[in-house]
């Protein structure tokens, strides 16, 4: 796995680095940025507590990942994730 950097903004909503790794360890959906940002991806998944999380990260030029957002999924994101998980 690539080295992962966490922006302070990633922790703004009370989630932690551990939550990010828990999403990666489970069943997640990876999509390109819904805002059309280059080299930015979104993960929809769950942590071990069962929270539905939305993670946004950028792939840096040196191939490291910079996570800058972790928060609960919106209702639309949750429905999309649940369709994927079936």
Predicted regions: what is each one?
Residues 1-86:
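Ribonuclease/tRNase effector modules and their secretory precursors
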């Amino acid at each position: 796995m690539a080295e992962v950097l966490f922006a302070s903004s990633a922790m703004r909503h009370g989630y932690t680095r551990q939550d990010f790794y828990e999403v990666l360890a489970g069943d997640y959906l990876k999509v390109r940025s819904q805002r059309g940002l280059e080299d930015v991806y979104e993960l929809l998944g769950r942590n071990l507590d069962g929270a539905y999380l939305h993670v946004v990260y950028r792939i840096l030029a040196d191939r490291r990942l910079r996570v800058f957002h972790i928060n609960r999924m919106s209702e639309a994101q949750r429905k999309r994730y649940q369709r994927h998980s079936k």
